[in-house]
């Protein structure tokens, strides 16, 4: 059974692509009775506030017609930002060599949070170098992962 995030992604990915943007990912977060639906978009050269506004209007129109969400919700459209979330294996592959933080569904070695250099992606295994040691994680056990921003002054 598809999650709400997967259903929404299927619904809006093609229209967003037709507008010239990549749908990086969808997050749904509940706070009480309200749901926040967060869409991350990107394109070559980055996205502007106007781009986010245009995509928000298009997606709102789609949601009005298709009515995929039963609850009250807030729609947020933004760029992935410097701490870009990683949603797919292709995202991990793209950022091999970068520092990331990973939050696991099921702890490994009594830890849920791991930070290190993304060394490789093989099949559904993500390998990080953590404190000089290699540690592999099953993609399915990763609840959330983000790039660690690099600031060069």
Curated annotation (Swiss-Prot):
One record GO biological process: ribosomal small subunit assembly
Broad class of the protein's primary localization: cytoplasm
Alphabetical list of InterPro entries matching this protein: Ribosome_maturation_RimP (IPR003728), RimP_C (IPR028998), RimP_C_sf (IPR036847), RimP_N (IPR028989), RimP_N_sf (IPR035956)
Highest taxon listed in the record's lineage: Bacteria
Gene3D superfamilies: Ribosome maturation factor RimP, C-terminal domain, RimP-like superfamily, N-terminal
Keyword check for Cytoplasm: yes
GO cellular component: cytosol
Subcellular location: Cytoplasm
Keyword list, A-Z: Cytoplasm, Ribosome biogenesis
Keyword Transmembrane helix in record: no
SUPFAM superfamilies: YhbC-like, C-terminal domain, YhbC-like, N-terminal domain
HAMAP family membership: RimP (MF_01077)
Family note: Belongs to the RimP family.
Function (record text): Required for maturation of 30S ribosomal subunits.
Protein name according to UniProt: Ribosome maturation factor RimP
Organism: Glaesserella parasuis serovar 5 (strain SH0165)
Recorded name of the encoding gene: rimP
